[in-house]
Amino acid sequence: PGPAALRRGRSRATPFFPPPRAGLYRRPITTPAFPAQTEPQAVEATIGLARLAGARGWVPGTAGNFSVRIDLARAAITASGGQKGEVDESGVIVADIAANLDGPVQPRLSAEGPLHLQLYRDDPAIGAIAHAHPLSAVVLSRRHLAAGRIVFEGWEMQKAVTGVTTHEGSIELPVFANDQDTKRLGLRVSEAMKSWKRPCFGYLIAGHGIYAWGRDAFEARKHLEAYAHLLDLVLEEERRA
């Protein structure tokens, strides 16, 4: 059945996610590696990501943004405003990935949209992005801004990050200072991520929240949940120290 039939057959509270696809997220890459899909499929998967975050309490107010790539030129992305946990098709737009950074803002594109589009421009393997505001992500991003990173070491949940096969060793999540000029922020993040330790499928904006991604909506969800859990563990461990 198509996306419309799937919507009719499930409750509003049940997010839809496509099944995981074969293959791994790899760098460097010279050809597109995201799963090919239609615009309605990308819109449906975007809605699923947004509703999941809403159910977890990660998008208070009208916070958060979620997107799924359609092809090399376009991505479905939640529009500015509106409760992301209750979003439907009317709250998702199709954005031009290659839009001129110096040009006018695309209609209904949120202030955080440029960060999504910059990630898609930088890496053709990225097929979906989730931006949310888990409490631990917001608190720890401020606390660890001076260090520029949060290190996770010895946690079994590290293995939920694609490419990590053991709890031994460490992985890092970058932390960047916030900037209301999100086009400028996107370029600054882009430059820093070029040399960042892999595997890494996310970053934090200080006092704001987390961006997590993957080659499809399933993997983006997995990384969002994994990083949120790891951040909860670090916050609790620091509280007890």
Q: What are the functions of these language-model segments?
A:
Residues 29-241:
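Glycine-rich flexible loops
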